[in-house]
UniProtKB/Swiss-Prot annotation:
Source organism per UniProt: Escherichia coli O1:K1 / APEC
Keywords: Cytoplasm, GTP-binding, Hydrolase, Magnesium, Metal-binding, Nucleotide-binding
Required cofactor names: Mg(2+)
Enzyme class, first EC level, given as a word: hydrolase
UniProt-listed SUPFAM superfamilies: Obg GTP-binding protein N-terminal domain, P-loop containing nucleoside triphosphate hydrolases
GO biological process assignments: ribosome biogenesis
Main location per the UniProt record: cytoplasm
Recorded name of the encoding gene: obg
Protein name, per record: GTPase Obg
UniProt-annotated binding residues for GTP: 166-173, 191-195, 213-216, 283-286, 314-316
PANTHER family in the cross-refs: DEVELOPMENTALLY REGULATED GTP-BINDING PROTEIN-RELATED, MITOCHONDRIAL RIBOSOME-ASSOCIATED GTPASE 2
One Pfam family hit: GTP1_OBG
PROSITE patterns, per the entry: G_OBG (PS51710), GTP1_OBG (PS00905), OBG (PS51883)
Cited CDD domains: Obg (cd01898)
One term under GO cellular component: cytoplasm
Amino acid sequence: MKFVDEASILVVAGDGGNGCVSFRREKYIPKGGPDGGDGGDGGDVWMEADENLNTLIDYRFEKSFRAERGQNGASRDCTGKRGKDVTIKVPVGTRVIDQGTGETMGDMTKHGQRLLVAKGGWHGLGNTRFKSSVNRTPRQKTNGTPGDKRELLLELMLLADVGMLGMPNAGKSTFIRAVSAAKPKVADYPFTTLVPSLGVVRMDNEKSFVVADIPGLIEGAAEGAGLGIRFLKHLERCRVLLHLIDIDPIDGTDPVENARIIISELEKYSQDLAAKPRWLVFNKIDLLDKVEAEEKAKAIAEALGWEDKYYLISAASGLGVKDLCWDVMTFIIENPVVQAEEAKQPEKVEFMWDDYHRQQLEEIAEEDDEDWDDDWDEDDEEGVEFIYKR
């Protein structure tokens, strides 16, 4: 299946149903009073994370999602039916962004997690709500409010513990093939890897971690050159980055300059990503003898001002790979993920009462109080009946 990690969609919640103006009319009951019911609330639009999905390709073709409108109120104080909700299923790891405001609405990081992205409109009030001692036959009602409408950007970010960084042909895909069951394409030309891939590294029956391989970075990636900048977002949730350096590039480029390009592109893309723990890993040491490889790695590390530990491996032969993986496993165990507190979603209710409707009633009541003297008429049957009962 084609890997798609971005999609734009339109979500429209249902409008609230309108209130009804109706009066009870039955035999032997000439003045039954108002019996117009309220409308129903509009349906909501929800996002739900599904671990069985791994791409957003479906939303390249289906771009619009609309919830059902609430039904209008009816006579006999019948409340309109609530509009049906719409649920949009997305892969785990999807970030939802409101394109209108640029706000991140939420990150779908767990299977079954739900996020409200468009709230349905509130119901309108029927004329029964406006009955009072001074207004026995109200003809007022309110209409339902419109539902939310948003254009959303969906960004799929792979959930991995370890991210791979490096220039094209640094050996990232060879490394992930060596340590996991993932089989990304490997060849001796740049940009063999065109889409991100994940591999699970199992150290024993109880310990494992997930590593992500993305297309290599080149100079100018932050301005759109190459492929890697598009996929850097997949590294934002990684706990540690493995920076692979080809210790003896076949094209004759300088390993120090190559490493500086990667660091520079990280800083241009995101300071948060650049600040993540990054380990230096020298690959393809099997192409040199042991002493020469150690001397060259030391010289490169000193030129970069690197004072931390670095690793020498050969992904092709497996030399040094196991020790590196165990150190990664230890780091992950000692640095567990801090789960961000999820925003509490509003509870779903069948009937909504709120400040909006209270305000509507208060405004109508104020109008009735102000105009009551002017509206009173000696021929008004209601007025006569009211005085008679007193």
